[in-house]
A protein has these predicted regions:
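Active-site anion/phosphate-binding pocket segments in diverse small-molecule metabolic enzymes
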Residues: 2-21, 73, 92, 99, ...
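Active-site-proximal beta-alpha core segment in soluble small-molecule metabolic enzymes
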Residues: 2-7, 11-15, 19-22, 29, ...
Length: 400
C-alpha cells in the first residue's frame, strides 16, 4: 500500500473508516433503543466511497441497511457482496424491475402503474417482493399525498398479492432550520396518515421512518422505527442551526496533494488565467497539481487556502483545470515534494469541508459529492491504509 500512496501523490482523498464507525455509534447512542439506522450511501457515499463504507457496517446489528438513489448504485453494493437490505429512495425505471426483485433490492413506490408492474413481475418470478411507500408531506418532490386518495393507494398496495408493504416514509424539507414548525407539521401529518392507513386496513407497517440527519439530531420524536443517516455519517453537519452538542462527529474525509514546483517572482507578476492576481512584492509561489477537474472548484480562486507544514497558504490567481498556485512566502522551509492539505488537519490548522463549501458557494455535502473520479480514495482503518478505489484501475470500456 506504500507504493499505492506514492502513486497517488498528485491528489488523494483519505477516508477514515474509524470516523464512520464513531459517527454511527454517536447516532446509535442518541436515538431511542430499538430504532434502526439506514445508512444513506447514495452518490458513492456522498463522494466518500460506498462499497468500503458498507463493508464496515455489514455486521452492525443496529444498521438495518442502506439507502441509495438508483438500482445501479444498489447493484454496485450487491456485486461487492453487500447483503443487508437496500432501499432505492427515488424512482425506479421499468427496465430494472426484474433485477431489483431478483437481487432483493427494495423500491420506493408512489405511482399506481409502478405498483402493478412490480406486482405482475414478482408474480411471474414467483416471489414476494418488499416495497416502501413514499408520502409527500411537504417536500413536493415524489410521494403520495396524505389524503383520502393516498389512503386508497395504500389499500391498493396492500391488496397486491406479490408485494409486501414493508415500510412507509416521508422526507423533511426544513428539519435543518432553527424553526422546526414546518418539520413538526410534516411529522404530525405523516403520523396521522400512517395511523389512518393502519387502522383502516388492520395492518402494521414494519418500518415507519422520516428522520434525516437533521431530524436525528434535533427531532427525537421523529426517530421512529428507523432513521436515515446521510450527511452526519460522514462527519458533516446538516446546517449551522442544528444542535452540535447533541452528537460528537468526526470528519471522515481528508484531501491531500504535494507541491510540484516552487519559484520566486518579483512584484508586478500576473498569476494564472487572466492575471486576476498580481504580486505586490517578491513572492514565493508553489504549484499544486489539483484543479477543478478533480472537484476542487474554480470559486476558490483568490479566496481559498491550503495547509503546508502546519501553516495556511492562500490561493493566488485562478484555479485551473488541473493545477493552482499558492503564496508560500511565509513558509520559507517548504519545498517541492512537500505534502499539501486541501481538506483536513496539519498541525494546529484545520480546513473543513464546511469552510470550503461556504467560500465556494456550495453546501458541504455538495462539495464532497463533487470530488471527481480522477481523485483516488484510500480507506484507512486504525490509522493504516486498508483498501483503495481508483477509477483508472476499475474502469471497463464496453462497445455499445
Amino acid at each position: 500500500m506504500i507504493n499505492r500512496l506514492e502513486q497517488y501523490s498528485r491528489v488523494c482523498a483519505h477516508i477514515n473508516l474509524d470516523a464512520v464507525l464513531h459517527n454511527l455509534e454517536q447516532m446509535h447512542a442518541h436515538i431511542s433503543e430499538g430504532t434502526k439506522i439506514m445508512a444513506v450511501i447514495k452518490a458513492d457515499a456522498y463522494g466518500h466511497g460506498a462499497v468500503p463504507i458498507a463493508w464496515e457496517m455489514e455486521e452492525l446489528s443496529y444498521v438495518y441497511g442502506y439507502g441509495v438513489a438508483s438500482v445501479e448504485e444498489a447493484m454496485q453494493l450487491r456485486n461487492a457482496n453487500i447483503r443487508k437490505p437496500i432501499l432505492v429512495l427515488g424512482y425506479t425505471f421499468p427496465y430494472s424491475y426484474e433485477t431489483l426483485i431478483n437481487q432483493e433490492i427494495t423500491p420506493t413506490v408512489f405511482r399506481r402503474d409502478v405498483l402493478h408492474q412490480l406486482d405482475e413481475i414478482a408474480g411471474r418470478m414467483n416471489v414476494k417482493s418488499p416495497i416502501h411507500i413514499k408520502v409527500d408531506t411537504g417536500m413536493t418532490r415524489i410521494g403520495i399525498r396524505p389524503d383520502e386518495e393516498g389512503v386508497a393507494f395504500v389499500k391498493e398496495a396492500l391488496a397486491c398479492e406479490n408485494l409486501i408493504v414493508e415500510g412507509i416514509f416521508t422526507h423533511f424539507s426544513k428539519a435543518d432550520e432553527a424553526d422546526k414548525a414546518f418539520a413538526n407539521g410534516q411529522l404530525q401529518s405523516f403520523l396521522s396518515f400512517v395511523k389512518k392507513c393502519e387502522e383502516e386496513n388492520d395492518y402494521k407497517f414494519k418500518l415507519v421512518h422520516c428522520s434525516n440527519s437533521a431530524g436525528i439530531i434535533d427531532m427525537p420524536d421523529a426517530n421512529l422505527d428507523m432513521v436515515r443517516a446521510g450527511i452526519i455519517l460522514y462527519g458533516m453537519w446538516p446546517s449551522e442551526d442544528v444542535d452540535k452538542n447533541a452528537v460528537d462527529l468526526e470528519p471522515v474525509l481528508s484531501l491531500k496533494s504535494h507541491i510540484v514546483y516552487v519559484k520566486d517572482v518579483e512584484a508586478g507578476i500576473p498569476v494564472s488565467y487572466n492575471g486576476t492576481y498580481i504580486t505586490d512584492r517578491t513572492t514565493r509561489i508553489a504549484t499544486i497539481p489539483v484543479g477543478y477537474a478533480d472537484g476542487y472548484p474554480r470559486n476558490l480562486s483568490n479566496t481559498g487556502t491550503v495547509i503546508i507544514a502546519g501553516k495556511r497558504a492562500p490561493i493566488i490567481g485562478r484555479v485551473c483545470m488541473d493545477q493552482f498556485m499558492v503564496d508560500v512566502t511565509g513558509i520559507p522551509e517548504c519545498k517541492e515534494g512537500d505534502e499539501v492539505t486541501l481538506i483536513g488537519r496539519d498541525g494546529d490548522e484545520y480546513i473543513t469541508v464546511e469552510e470550503l463549501g461556504t467560500i465556494s458557494g456550495r453546501f458541504n455535502y455538495e462539495f464532497a459529492c463533487e470530488i471527481g473520479k480522477r481523485t483516488p480514495r484510500v480507506f484507512f482503518r486504525h490509522g493504516k491504509a486498508f483498501c483503495a478505489k481508483d477509477y483508472y484501475d476499475d474502469v471497463k470500456i464496453k462497445k455499445i
